[in-house]
C-alpha cells in the first residue's frame, strides 16, 4: 500500500479536531446516486452571525472500464469547476487530471494539470497552474518504510524563478498510532499525535509554534463512540476554547450533528457558538 499524500500526513489527528463540529452554522448535506452511477452531492450552510447563505452542487460520473472520472461543481458564488481524471490506465498507480475554474461574473478563469503516482513505498504529487505569464509548479513526495514516513513539499514560481515553499515532514504510523511532525519554510513548526486507545476511544494532540513570535498553540481532543449510531467529541486549546459535539444516526442515511464552542476565558460574557448539521444520504 502506498504512503499517503503529503497533504494527508497527520490527517487522523486533524480529523479529531475538525470533523463533527459546525460552530456558528446551520448546515445541510445531501448525497445521492442514480441507478446509472451518477453521484450528486449538495451542500449548504447559513452563518448564524452574518446570515449569509452558501450552497454548492457537485456531480460525479465514473467510467470504470476506462478509469475515467468526470466531476462538475457549482456554488452560489457563481463559480464553475470541472475536472477530468484518468487513473491506472497508462501505469498502475498513476493518476492524471485536468481541472478548470470559471467565474462568469468577474471573468476570472484558471486551469491546472495534476499528476499523482503511488507505489508501495512512495507517493508523489505535482500540479502546474496553467498561466501564460508563467505557471506555478507545486510538487511533493512521501517515502515510507516500515511505518516511518518522510515527506517534502515545494513550490516553484516560474515568473520570479525561485522556490516559494520548502516544507519538510517526518512521522511514524501504525494501525492505532500516528506521529506527525512538520517544518514549514523553516519558520513554522508543528506536531500531532493520534492514538486509538480502544475500539471506542480516539485521542488527538496538536502543537504548533512559529519562530520569531511567542505564539504557541496547543490542543487536545477526543472522540468516543457510544454505540454503533452515536458518538461524542470534545476538544480544548490553550486559548481556553472548549468544543463539544454529539453525532447521532437517526436512521439509515440520516445523521444529526450538534456542536458548541465555549469561550472559557469569557464564560459569562456570552458569544458562545452552536452548530447544527444534518446529513442525508440515499
UniProtKB/Swiss-Prot annotation:
The keyword Ubl conjugation applies. It is found in: Mitochondrion outer membrane. GO terms for molecular function: porin activity; voltage-gated monoatomic anion channel activity. Changing residue 109 to R: Poly-KR; increase in apoptosis when overexpressed in muscle cells, resulting in wing posture abnormalities. This is Voltage-dependent anion-selective channel. There is a cross-link at residues 11, 19, 52, 109, 273 (Glycyl lysine isopeptide (Lys-Gly) (interchain with G-Cter in ubiquitin)). The lineage of its organism: Eukaryota, Metazoa, Ecdysozoa, Arthropoda, Hexapoda. One of its GO terms (biological process) is negative regulation of apoptotic process. Keywords: Ion transport, Isopeptide bond, Membrane, Mitochondrion, Mitochondrion outer membrane, Porin, Transmembrane, Transmembrane beta strand, Transport, Ubl conjugation. Transmembrane segments: none annotated. Ubiquitinated. Undergoes monoubiquitination and polyubiquitination by park; monoubiquitination at Lys-273 inhibits apoptosis, whereas polyubiquitination at Lys-11, Lys-19, Lys-52 and Lys-109 may promote mitophagy.
Amino acid at each position: 500500500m502506498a504512503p499517503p499524500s503529503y497533504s494527508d500526513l497527520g490527517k487522523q489527528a486533524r480529523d479529531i479536531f475538525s470533523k463533527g463540529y459546525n460552530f456558528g452554522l446551520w448546515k445541510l448535506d445531501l448525497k445521492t446516486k442514480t441507478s446509472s452511477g451518477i453521484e450528486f452531492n449538495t451542500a449548504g450552510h447559513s452563518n448564524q452571525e452574518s446570515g449569509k447563505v452558501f450552497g454548492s452542487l457537485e456531480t460525479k460520473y465514473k467510467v470504470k472500464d476506462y478509469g475515467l472520472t468526470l466531476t462538475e461543481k457549482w456554488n452560489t458564488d457563481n463559480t464553475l469547476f470541472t475536472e477530468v481524471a484518468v487513473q491506472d490506465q497508462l501505469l498502475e498507480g498513476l493518476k492524471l487530471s485536468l481541472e478548470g475554474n470559471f467565474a462568469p461574473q468577474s471573468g476570472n478563469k484558471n486551469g491546472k494539470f495534476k499528476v499523482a503516482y503511488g507505489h508501495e513505498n512512495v507517493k508523489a504529487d505535482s500540479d502546474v497552474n496553467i498561466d501564460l505569464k508563467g505557471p506555478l509548479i507545486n510538487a511533493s513526495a512521501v517515502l515510507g518504510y516500515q511505518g516511518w514516513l518522510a515527506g517534502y513539499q515545494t513550490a516553484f514560481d516560474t515568473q520570479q524563478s525561485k522556490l516559494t515553499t520548502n516544507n519538510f515532514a517526518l512521522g511514524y504510523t501504525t494501525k492505532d498510532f500516528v506521529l506527525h511532525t512538520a517544518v514549514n519554510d523553516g519558520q513554522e513548526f508543528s506536531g500531532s499525535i493520534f492514538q486509538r486507545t480502544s475500539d471506542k476511544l480516539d485521542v488527538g494532540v496538536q502543537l504548533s509554534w512559529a519562530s520569531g513570535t511567542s505564539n504557541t498553540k496547543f490542543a487536545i481532543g477526543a472522540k468516543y463512540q457510544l454505540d454503533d449510531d452515536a458518538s461524542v467529541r470534545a476538544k480544548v486549546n490553550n486559548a481556553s476554547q472548549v468544543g463539544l459535539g454529539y453525532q447521532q444516526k437517526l436512521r439509515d442515511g440520516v445523521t444529526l450533528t450538534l456542536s458548541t464552542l465555549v469561550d472559557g476565558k469569557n464564560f459569562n460574557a456570552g458569544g458562545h457558538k452552536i452548530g447544527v448539521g444534518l446529513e442525508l444520504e440515499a
